[in-house]
């Protein structure tokens, strides 16, 4: 299924709020067409991605937590082979359509208060004029370089551990897609993976472009099988051809900082748009310059920046009609590191630029 959102506003995921109700109210006020459930990492350590996205691996004993956050695969445990086999059994059952198996991926109590409040709010108030609902999971490379084996080596470098992480994140994303789909709207599920920038870097020689592309496509295929549309978000600069060539529905990136490198791939951008892809333009700064960039911008200045970006894309023979219809307007990244007033301003500017989107293509 392809979509034409026409510059609608949504967010990336995280907010600085401690109160889930206030966070949901903010999202629904400024992103009414594509509300997302808010991640609240400041509110509770269990909102950290290890607990939020990898709870099944903890439940099965595949992962252990050291201290508050450091997670490692317990590969040396005598029960490791049986635990891995149990995990793959759950994955295969879910892949064959078992809702009971997929429900093993439900967030544990306290791990996603924003999700709980978001879904309760949708059930109580309805979804108003929403056209889509959005969820998000951690990225494979981000998780794979933070989680280690017992010797401290990043899990991503171990093919078995990497595959377990990929399938776990695919399951979690599919569970979100299926759960949001029950409200009767299409679900957009983003994999948030800033560490994907490391693909092809000399100090990450174990990160193969071909393997990353294959993994992205496997993730996308699995989530689509649960009824979701699939995006990847990165707030770091990278070789954008990787995402443009992947089988994704949406590419989300920090356009405030990195539009100049993204536009260097006009042929791939054209091809991506022509096959129905959507670009989520992160046009509102979130942390660039330690907050100074946000303080120095207003709606008029952001419209000017966006207009110049569109002119550059047109100069490179990218079809503006496709850009107009197949775009989203978002913050550059999540807003958890900002203050609550700064986060509100980011969302205000996002909504304002989305409202002005179509006017940028006239005159």
Question: What do the PLM-derived regions correspond to, one by one?
Answer:
Residues 1-157, 277, 312, 325, ...:
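Alpha/beta catalytic barrel-like cores
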Residues 37-40, 134-138, 190-192, 231-235, ...:
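A cross-family glycoside hydrolase active-site/sugar-binding cleft signature
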Residues 103-120, 159-175, 301-309:
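Glycine-rich anion/phosphate-binding loops
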Residues 119, 123, 177, 216-225, ...:
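Surface-exposed amphipathic alpha-helices with a cationic face
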Residues 126-131, 181-186, 274, 318-325:
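Short helix-terminating capping/connector loops at secondary-structure junctions
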Residues 135, 154, 160-266:
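Active-site loop segments of alpha/beta catalytic cores
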Residues 142-147, 197-201, 290:
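Short acidic/His/Gly/Ser-rich catalytic and metal-binding motifs that mark active-site loops
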Residues 249-362:
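Catalytic-face loop-and-helix region of soluble metabolic enzyme cores
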């Amino acid at each position: 299924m392809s979509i034409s959102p026409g510059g609608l506003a949504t967010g990336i995921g995280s907010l600085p709020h401690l109160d889930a109700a206030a966070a949901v109210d903010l999202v629904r006020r400024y992103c009414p067409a594509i509300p997302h459930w808010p991640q609240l990492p400041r509110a509770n350590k269990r909102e950290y991605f290890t607990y939020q996205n990898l709870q099944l691996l903890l439940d099965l004993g595949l992962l252990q937590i050291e201290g508050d956050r450091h997670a490692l695969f317990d590969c040396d445990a005598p029960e490791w082979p049986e635990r891995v086999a149990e995990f793959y059994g759950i994955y295969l059952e879910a892949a064959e359509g078992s809702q009971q198996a997929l429900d093993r991926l439900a967030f544990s109590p306290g791990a996603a208060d924003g999700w709980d409040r978001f879904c309760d709010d949708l059930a109580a108030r309805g979804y108003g004029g929403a056209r889509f609902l959005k969820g998000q999971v951690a990225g494979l490379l981000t998780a794979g370089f933070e989680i280690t084996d017992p010797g401290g080596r990043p899990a991503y470098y171990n093919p078995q551990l990497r595959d377990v992480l990929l399938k776990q994140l695919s399951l979690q994303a599919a569970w979100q897609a299926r759960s949001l789909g029950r409200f009767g709207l299409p679900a957009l599920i983003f994999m948030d993976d800033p560490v994907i920038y490391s693909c092809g870097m000399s100090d990450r020689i174990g990160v193969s472009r071909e393997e990353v592309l294959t993994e992205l496509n496997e993730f996308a295929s699995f989530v689509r099988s649960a009824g979701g549309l699939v995006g990847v978000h990165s707030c770091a600069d990278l070789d954008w051809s990787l995402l443009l060539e992947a089988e994704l529905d949406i590419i989300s990136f920090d356009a405030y900082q990195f539009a100049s490198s993204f536009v260097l791939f006009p042929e791939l951008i054209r091809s991506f748009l022509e096959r129905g892809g959507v670009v989520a333009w992160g046009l509102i700064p979130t942390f660039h310059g330690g907050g100074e960039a946000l303080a120095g911008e207003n709606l008029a200045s952001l419209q000017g920046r966006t207009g110049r970006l569109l002119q550059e894309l047109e100069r490179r023979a990218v079809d503006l009609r496709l850009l107009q219809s197949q775009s989203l307007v978002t913050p550059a990244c999540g807003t958890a590191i900002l203050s609550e007033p700064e986060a509100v301003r980011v969302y205000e500017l996002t909504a304002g630029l989305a409202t002005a989107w179509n006017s940028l293509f006239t005159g």
